[in-house]
Amino acid sequence: MQLRLATYNVEWFDALFDEQGYLQRDTVWSRRHNITRAQQIKALGTVVRRIDADAIMVVEAPDTSRQRNGVRALQRFAQVMGIRARKAQIGFVNDTQQEIILLYDPDVLHVRHAPRSDPDAPRFDGSLLIDLDVNETKEEVRFSKPPLEVE
């Protein structure tokens, strides 16, 4: 089986959705220079449709917060824009507004979040004790931007 995979870092994608995760297709300026939100949404839809990937890793996807669900927001985007990669999978949520979410075609793939860990490498929703400044004292490091691990 041959798969078509893509990665797309969409600058300011988050700003194209309201707090409930609905697209804001209007004439208000987007955060991109000299382009409206409607123009940016249309352009993104065109690009993603033409890529026509079985799965596309979206970097800087709509964030997930108490008000918004990034997975639902991306699935709405795919539905509105007629993109066959219409189901979304997120891993560990972060609070940096730079989520990584996989959009995929459920007719081709079955995807689930599958984080791994071992004693020397904790899961990315945990913390790591490591001597960062070589002072023989371990500091706790929390991961601010966890990768998305899927299978």
What are these regions (language model features)?
Residues 1-99, 136:
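N-terminal, active-site-proximal structural segment of metallo-dependent hydrolase catalytic domains
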Residues 63-64, 69-151:
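Structured beta-strand-rich core segments of catalytic domains in phosphoester-bond hydrolases
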